[in-house]
């Protein structure tokens, strides 16, 4: 059964294959186009550099009118990531637009890694370290990067 969401996701997948954004990759799981596995490579010249962070994107039949649920599977220490791996990112909530596609979501998440929003943190400890003790924050992030190589 073909739905608008499934057709759109296949277009998103085709775009990811033909014009992949730097440092991100994603594809639907073999038997369900509504569930995607993704990987974000930590941006160069940031504490996240060389990290390989796995994520899951869960879409429903209302996509693209409703954003997917996006969750880190890899361990992540970041002001805008809950301990569950779920993200606090405006474009996945109140600033969602149907014009966003999978590539836009992943590049936004990648950008968020080095530019957190500390005004409404999901991880208060990470936010406080980021603002007040940057060296400690960066050490915790580097520990997360190393963990990303084995998880």
Swiss-Prot record:
Instruction: Give the Gene3D superfamilies listed for this entry.
Output: Ubiquitin Conjugating Enzyme (3.10.110.10)
Its recorded name reads: Ubiquitin-conjugating enzyme E2 2
For the keyword ATP-binding, the answer is yes
Give the main localization category: cytoplasm
Documented EC number(s)? 2.3.2.23
- Which superkingdom heads the taxonomic lineage of this protein's source? Eukaryota
- The UBC core domain extends over 4-150
- Organism, by scientific name, is Yarrowia lipolytica (strain CLIB 122 / E 150) (Yeast)
This protein's gene is called: UBC2
Q: Which reaction does it catalyse?
A: S-ubiquitinyl-[E1 ubiquitin-activating enzyme]-L-cysteine + [E2 ubiquitin-conjugating enzyme]-L-cysteine = [E1 ubiquitin-activating enzyme]-L-cysteine + S-ubiquitinyl-[E2 ubiquitin-conjugating enzyme]-L-cysteine
Molecular function (GO) terms for this protein are: ATP binding; proteasome binding; single-stranded DNA binding; single-stranded DNA helicase activity; ubiquitin conjugating enzyme activity
Q: Cellular component GO terms, alphabetically?
A: chromosome, telomeric region; cytoplasm; HULC complex; MUB1-RAD6-UBR2 ubiquitin ligase complex; nucleus; Rad6-Rad18 complex; RAD6-UBR2 ubiquitin ligase complex; UBR1-RAD6 ubiquitin ligase complex
Give compartment(s): Cytoplasm; Nucleus
Q: What Gene Ontology terms for biological process does this UniProt record contain?
A: cellular response to unfolded protein; cytoplasm protein quality control by the ubiquitin-proteasome system; DNA repair; DNA-templated transcription termination; double-strand break repair via homologous recombination; ERAD pathway; error-free postreplication DNA repair; error-free translesion synthesis
> Pathway it acts in?
Protein modification; protein ubiquitination
Query: Which keywords does this Swiss-Prot/TrEMBL entry list?
Result: ATP-binding, Chromatin regulator, Cytoplasm, DNA damage, DNA repair, Nucleotide-binding, Nucleus, Sporulation, Transcription, Transcription regulation, Transferase, Ubl conjugation pathway
The UniProt function text for this chain reads: Catalyzes the covalent attachment of ubiquitin to other proteins. Plays a role in transcription regulation by catalyzing the monoubiquitination of histone H2B to form H2BK123ub1. H2BK123ub1 gives a specific tag for epigenetic transcriptional activation and is also a prerequisite for H3K4me and H3K79me formation. Also involved in postreplication repair of UV-damaged DNA, in N-end rule-dependent protein degradation and in sporulation.
In terms of InterPro entries, this protein maps to: Ub_conjugating_enzyme, UBQ-conjugat_E2_core, UBQ-conjugating_AS, UBQ-conjugating_enzyme/RWD
Q: Which residues form the signal peptide?
A: none
Give the family from UniProt. Answer: Belongs to the ubiquitin-conjugating enzyme family.
